[in-house]
Swiss-Prot record:
Disruption phenotype: Plant are deficient in a variety of auxin-regulated growth processes including lateral root formation, and hypocotyl and cell elongation. The record marks 139, 165, 380, 489 as: Interaction with auxin-responsive proteins. The myo-inositol hexakisphosphate acts as a structural cofactor. It holds the Pfam family Transp_inhibit. Residues 3-50 form the F-box domain. Changing residue 33 to A: No affinity for auxin. It comes from Arabidopsis thaliana. CDD domains: F-box_AtTIR1-like (cd22159). Expressed in roots, stems, leaves and flowers. In adult plants, mostly expressed in floral stigma, anther filaments, abscission zones and vascular tissues. Changing residue 10 to A: Abolishes SCF(TIR1) complex formation, altered auxin-mediated response and reduced affinity for auxin. InterPro entries: COI1_F-box (IPR041567), F-box-like_dom_sf (IPR036047), F-box_dom (IPR001810), Leu-rich_rpt_Cys-con_subtyp (IPR006553), LRR_dom_sf (IPR032675), Transp_inhibit (IPR041101). This is Protein TRANSPORT INHIBITOR RESPONSE 1. (indol-3-yl)acetate binds at residues 403, 438-439.
Length: 594
């Protein structure tokens, strides 16, 4: 019956219907209905997302989806953001660009995260894709402003250039001048990560001649005195990153900035504010009533000035801020911003032992009580209680992402000195739609039992300095049906939990473990047992076979793949496929023979 229904629609109709299906997992499900749907979906797929660049080869993707216009790739594991992945590990995008340059000549969008991108890559992109429109490089490295100059000079239809949090070699600040004088298509520009000055005259000319520019995020080197000039050239902006927000207090600078901002009637998102001078903050008040996003994570502004600013932002939906906001500021946020969906509070002094601000669990409790739409939290603090976590869970059962980072590892409930198991247990029990969870504080295996029992929709879990034994990890792997990414550091989890749940790993995207109790022997056995997994031992102490098999490895990264072992492994990475484990065995036999 299903086959007859599938065949009753012309291909053109099905292609049109499929175009409304946006989620990759839904597109994948559609392609499994029957052979004809598989072929139609294959030829009409325009966007591809690959969460691990080593999970599949470029050739396989190109063969599977010949008409792709947009590619999104991720490289290094998430823990690379915390310097836990050694330099030179991999994540090189050049093989992908090289393969796509000859097969996807009409490619329009490339979005990369945590990948190594060289100037050669950027030059090849500029040369190969004639209708190229979007380049997003998020937390990438390896390229310079010379590569950006090639993009600017050649990609005449470029709409978006986003370098968010990338490490760029600033060879020259004049790369913006490579955009041709006839170029007018820019919609979004993010250069906030650049350390050096850019040519302001080139930037001003670019902004002036792009009437559709909606998002402009400047770097710290753009002085506050010149911001008003750019705003006057682009009053249509919807998103602004201010760059440096410091200057000698002068009435003419303040009034010029205030007038320019008041002319930006469409502005909805503000960020930047490096080294913000409080005296200039009231200049933004005229746009605050419309703001939905405010990123103050670089603004070292004290609570008093933050409170005055937040009182002007009743429509705020997303706030990123340093812990200078303190509990008092979060109470004002809770009473003012009833539409708040996302809150991130970052530490101003993460390596200072004594607290430098009055930020506690009470601030988060206040927001959970006052903001009924809150669904995403990242909260750095120095103390927490089970009672507070239980209250937050009951107040906000709609939470989908909850990441709590208590700065001191293994910190207990500071009032009772008990583990925080019950508190996090309440989070996973009450928040039925929880997708992402990060744990911290003193935690036993009990919390992982709660997670395995209740967190049925959780897709990503981050764990550090937690648990008692393999049982904790076993609870998670055996109980969390939707788990896709698990990252663990400094926990006593080892061989038993890993090997007992080997089949679960084939349903996940990846597992990262560092400074745990996983042995080299278990990694070898897992690699032999599960050929669809790449089991990569990362050990900078030397070849793991030079030590007893019972010796724990420094790091292991396990991920599902249809491409087999990768070919760009550095000298400190070993793949535990069957061939490599046989080579290790022969080496051990030879060594013992000597």
């Amino acid at each position: 019956m299903q086959k007859r229904i599938a065949l009753s629609f012309p291909e053109e109709v099905l292609e049109h219907v499929f175009s409304f299906i946006q989620l990759d997992k839904d597109r994948n499900s559609v392609s499994l209905v029957c052979k004809s749907w598989y072929e139609i979906e294959r030829w009409c797929r325009r966007k591809v997302f690959i969460g691990n660049c080593y999970a599949v080869s470029p050739a396989t993707v190109i063969r599977r989806f010949p008409k792709v216009r947009s590619v999104e790739l991720k490289g290094k594991p998430h823990f690379a953001d915390f310097n836990l992945v050694p330099d030179g590990w991999g994540g090189y995008v050049y093989p992908w660009i090289e393969a796509m340059s000859s097969s996807y000549t009409w490619l329009e969008e490339i979005r990369l995260k945590r990948m190594v991108v060289t100037d050669d890559c950027l030059e090849l992109i500029a040369k190969s894709f004639k209708n190229f429109k979007v380049l997003v490089l998020s937390s990438c490295e390896g390229f310079s402003t010379d590569g950006l100059a090639a993009i600017a000079a050649t990609c005449r239809n470029l709409k978006e250039l986003d370098l968010r949090e990338s490490d760029v070699d600033d060879v020259s600040g004049h790369w913006l001048s490579h955009f041709p004088d006839t170029y007018t298509s820019l919609v979004s520009l993010n250069i906030s990560c650049l350390a050096s000055e850019v040519s302001f005259s080139a930037l001003e000319r670019l902004v002036t001649r792009c009437p559709n520019l909606k998002s402009l995020k400047l770097n710290r080197a753009v002085p506050l005195e010149k911001l008003a000039t750019l705003l006057q050239r682009a009053p249509q902006l919807e998103e602004l990153g201010t760059g440096g927000y410091t200057a000698e207090v002068r009435p003419d600078v303040y009034s010029g900035l205030s007038v320019a901002l008041s002319g930006c009637k469409e502005l909805r998102c503000l960020s930047g504010f490096w080294d913000a001078v409080p005296a200039y903050l009231p200049a933004v008040y005229s746009v605050c009533s419309r703001l939905t996003t405010l990123n103050l994570s670089y603004a070292t502004v004290q609570s008093y000035d933050l409170v005055k600013l937040l009182c002007q932002c009743p429509k705020l939906q997303r706030l990123w801020v340093l812990d200078y906001i303190e509990d008092a500021g979060l109470e004002v946020l809770a009473s003012t911003c009833k539409d708040l969906r996302e809150l991130r509070v970052f530490p101003s002094e993460p390596f200072v032992m004594e607290p430098n601000v009055a930020l506690t669990e009470q601030g988060l409790v206040s927001v959970s009580m006052g903001c009924p739409k809150l669904e995403s939290v990242l909260y750095f603090c120095r103390q927490m209680t089970n009672a507070a976590l239980i209250t937050i869970a009951r107040n906000r059962p709609n939470m989908t992402r909850f990441r709590l980072c208590i700065i001191e590892p293994k910190a207990p409930d500071y009032l009772t000195l008990e583990p925080l198991d019950i508190g996090f247990g309440a989070i996973v029990e009450h928040c039925k739609d929880l997708r992402r969870l990060s744990l911290s504080g003193l935690l036993t295996d009990k919390v992982f039992e709660y997670i395995g029992t209740y967190a049925k929709k959780m897709e990503m879990l981050s764990v550090a300095f937690a648990g008692d034994s393999d049982l904790g990890m076993h609870h998670v792997l055996s109980g969390c049906d939707s788990l896709r990414k698990l990252e663990i550091r400094d926990c006593p989890f080892g061989d038993k939990a890993l090997l007992a749940n080997a089949s679960k790993l084939e349903t996940m995207r990846s597992l990262w473990m560092s400074s745990c109790s996983v042995s080299f022997g278990a990694c070898k056995l897992l690699g032999q047992k599960m050929p669809k997994l790449n089991v990569e031992v990362i050990d900078e102490r030397g070849a793991p076979d030079s030590r007893p098999e019972s010796c724990p490895v420094e790091r292991v990264f396990i991920y599902r793949t249809v491409a087999g072992p990768r070919f760009d492994m550095p000298g400190f990475v070993w793949n535990m496929d069957q061939d490599s484990t046989m080579r290790f065995s022969r080496q051990i036999i030879t060594t013992n023979g000597l």
